Amino acid sequence: MKNYWFENKDADANGTCLQFRISIDQDFVWDHFGPSHFSGESVDDKVLAEWIFENQDGKVATLYDWKGSSQRNEWHIGAHDAETAHLFEIWLSNFHKREMQKQKIRA
């Protein structure tokens, strides 16, 4: 089974909630996914940056900071269920590893 995710800022992320946490440098996130899909601050000032992803099956996951974490390498993974979040976490971890290996090869 392929596990592929792509950014889709128009995907319906309503009802997603924290399922997992992941540590990835903020520069990596911004460099690879571009500007946040979320503009401004949330109504409750708890989210400053968020990206929405969708997989080949139409499942939605979000990657976001929570309460403007002072440690900008800590991100939350949100989804409608833990299985979807876990698939996204696997994809993101593997994507991060591949991109970091590419950087080492170039250096």
Region spans (language model):
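N-terminal trafficking/processing presequences and adjacent post-cleavage segments
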Residues: 1-24
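Mixed-charge, Lys/Arg-enriched low-complexity segments
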Residues: 2-10, 77-107
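Amphipathic alpha-helical segments
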Residues: 19-39
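A structural detector for beta-sheet-dominated domains
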Residues: 21-23, 54, 78-80
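Short, intrinsically disordered, mixed-charge
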Residues: 31-35, 68, 93-97
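Amphipathic, interaction-prone secondary-structure segments
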Residues: 35-66
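Intrinsically disordered, low-complexity regulatory segments enriched in Ser/Thr/Pro
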Residues: 61-87
